[in-house]
Amino acid sequence: MPIIRQYEDATDRFQVVELWRNVFGYETAHNEPNLAISKKISTNDGLFFVAVENTDILGTIMAGYDGHRGWLYSVAVDPNKRLSGLGSSLVHHAEKALADLGCMKINLQLLDTNKATAAFYKSIGYSVEPRLSMGKLITRSV
């Protein structure tokens, strides 16, 4: 099983970007992998993890905590390593890191059309909640 450790920009960025492009695709500029990574590491919160085997990055997870709720983002597993328990290990690692900060509840979002990912999260204890997710892009003119 790969080891899970904190993301290290100098050694990990190229592989993480490639993994995310392979797993997520990306259709919008605000989700561009290099931008997302730069913004995350600028927070310096220690909640960005990678799963590494030898020198290969096989998975990622980012978490966030605002003092009230925790969030999971960018959970990605190399397609050749799916169904190996790696996704569950990444989520549990982030859950522990959030719990260590005092977090009592974790949220996440996914597309309602992504049935396989929804089934994965349900299998590890997450449930659909009666909420409406809303968002707004903030432009430089704000």
Task: Locate each region found by the language model.
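A conserved beta-turn-beta hairpin within the catalytic core of GNAT-like acetyltransferases
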Residues: 64-73, 82, 129-130
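Active-site rim helix/loop that mediates acceptor-substrate recognition in acyltransferases
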Residues: 27-50
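Conserved beta-strand-loop-alpha-helix junction that forms the acyl-donor binding cleft
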Residues: 108-117, 135-139
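A short beta-loop-alpha structural element at the N-terminal edge
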Residues: 2-16
